[in-house]
A protein has these predicted regions:
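Alpha-helical transmembrane segments in multipass membrane proteins, preferentially the mid-helix core
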Residues: 76-91, 146-150
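Hydrophobic alpha-helical membrane segments
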Residues: 73, 77-81, 98-118, 137-140
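Hydrophobic transmembrane alpha-helical segments in integral membrane proteins
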Residues: 1-16
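Non-cytosolic membrane-interface motifs at loop->transmembrane helix junctions
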Residues: 61-72, 98, 123-134
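C-terminal transmembrane-bundle signature of multipass membrane proteins
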Residues: 113-119, 130-157
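A generic, lipid-embedded transmembrane alpha helix
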Residues: 41-55
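Membrane-interface helix-boundary motifs at transmembrane edges
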Residues: 24-36, 89-97, 155-159
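Juxtamembrane "helix-exit" motif on the non-cytosolic side of transmembrane helices
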Residues: 23-26, 52-61, 115-123
Length: 159
């Protein structure tokens, strides 16, 4: 049994239940902007994924085929979130496309990182960075889902 997979799946289930109970039912009452901004701020912290390249944060031998794409994908997602924030704050017409770009790239990054970690057996080498896929990735996956819901149903005109 892969304990990391169990942690990732169960944490995702817990975050999904929380979103379903507390956030999704309230989306019709909330302005899209008030939901998207905190999510973008959360994802702006994905630069922490660079820990997969930091000696001491991961154990020697972590597969580079996982570590580099995961770290750099997280950095790209963080930068895209930071770029989208001012557009959302200013209610720019670019807000929706920038948030959409961030959301697609960020989601693909997480799916790729999970797949690469599984394929290359990265879990035993994660060391202190283990909390990223066990806790952080599930939270990010669920918030990406929420943004897709907003982009698909609730986003009318500029934010």
């Amino acid at each position: 049994m892969n304990i990391l997979t169990v942690n990732l799946v169960l944490s995702t289930v817990v975050f999904a239940i929380a979103a379903r109970l507390y956030l999704i039912p309230n989306l019709p009452k909330l302005e899209a902007r008030s939901v998207v901004l905190p999510i973008l701020l959360l994802h702006a912290l994905r630069h922490l994924g660079l820990m997969f390249l930091a000696p001491g944060a991961v154990l020697p031998g972590i597969p580079e085929q996982f570590a580099y794409p995961a770290a750099l994908g997280d950095l790209l997602a963080a930068v895209l979130a930071l770029v989208a924030i001012p557009a959302v704050v200013r209610r720019s017409r670019l807000a929706r496309p920038l948030v959409g770009l961030f959301n697609v790239v960020g989601t693909i990054d997480l799916i790729a990182a999970i797949s690469l970690a599984t394929f290359y057996g990265a879990a035993p080498y994660m060391g202190p960075a283990y909390w990223i896929p066990a806790f952080w990735v599930p939270a990010l996956l669920v918030t990406h889902y929420v943004v897709f819901v907003l982009l698909g149903k609730r986003w009318y005109g500029p934010m």
